[in-house]
Amino acid sequence: MPATRVSYSTGHRDQERPLPLTTSPATYTLETLGFDPSWQGAAIRTAFALNGALEDFTLARVSAVHRTRCELLTCERGELIKLSAPLRPVENDYGEEEYPVVGDWVLTQPIPGTGDDTQPAEHKPLAILPRRSYLTRPSATRESADQPVAANVDMLCIVEPCFPEPSIGRIERYTALAHASGVQVALILTKGDLVTAEQLAGYRDSLGSGMDAVLTVCTDHGYDPAPVAELVAGRTAVFLGRSGAGKSTLVNALLSPGVDPREDSSENRVQATSSVRDADGKGRHTTTSRQMIVLPSSEESGAGSSVGTVLIDTPGVRALAATSDSSAIDETFDDVSSYAAACRYSDCSHSSEPGCAVQQALADGALDPERFERYRRMMAESARLRLRSQEREYRQSNRAFTKANKAGRRTLMSLKGRAN
């Protein structure tokens, strides 16, 4: 079924594309976008903080963020409405200003003088509702701050291909990000038809440690997205993985169940896909920005919930730094941290101290040396990231102090001039 198209207020070519939906419920509601009753109180309190009632604003969810603009989805009279808004800092529940990210719920108002009978008015986001979760990933560069991925996510789905050989280190880093954000984590192994049954079983056993779910899908034939659809039903799930992992192919399959991904026409594809190189199985970047995609309602899929299923597709990640949250790393490597808790000294470095339970476990063969080495590297990288973040915060506060000091001196000189 072709993707549904709607009108929306924009004069920018980069936003003139199909709305990411293929199946239309009889009536759209905010629940279709992932809204549930617990959001109502937060929305009312946020509206009150803006000196208004909830009815004075439009409640919308951020579906995409571009360089200077963002796209919003809301519902009106049973229809799904796509709005355009300028990308500007918005006040959050802490009274601080920050940019909206994909998945945020925002209160907006129309900008006077925009819109007409054929398209909605352009909107201005005024406040961000308190986030339930906020997923970020550390930048691979030395100076950049953490990069936002999505907000209000229930589950992080790690999409990892079986060919070329899966990277357990990358999976562990994604898992730590999920734990740092307080969301569930699932592993979806794609291209399972490119390896033997024995290899596939081995991957499931070795890579599924600490996961809430492990699923396998075959990209080239017999593609059945039903297990994944059941996993994400009634949730907001973000797909993360490297280029060529099959994230966009999986999204298209979820939107067009029963359609062979190889035979799916371009007009039915919400997300573009690219082939991988035969030599090494590596892919190219196809998805270039984070995009929120609404699936058919959970009621239609048999989940028995009125809350809709929302997917967030993301560009492939080339390099992934460790999270700065050391407790999330401990949770990911729960076997290592359990041994570490039994060490004689609380500040044990697990190298040569007497009474080190970790070294004893390594000597006894109870702990995999390669896994411990990955844990050690992630912990060291996490410590460097925290130090870098502290240095960056110090520079920012120092610049703010210098700016305020200069402004104070200018004001003082101005007052002295008037006195003379």
Question: Model segments located where?
Answer:
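Switch/coupling subdomain of P-loop NTPase systems
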Residues: 71-73, 101, 118-124, 144, ...
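SH3/SH3-like beta-barrel fold
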Residues: 70-75, 108
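Helix-rich effector regions associated with P-loop NTPase G domains
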Residues: 2-28, 53-56, 82, 94-105, ...
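Walker A/P-loop
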Residues: 243, 248, 253
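Conserved beta-strand/loop subsegment of P-loop NTPase cores
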Residues: 152-160, 180-192, 211-217
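Structural detector for short beta-strands of small beta-barrel domains
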Residues: 56-68
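A short macromolecule-binding patch
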Residues: 78-88
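Canonical P-loop GTPase G-domain recognition
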Residues: 184, 193-245
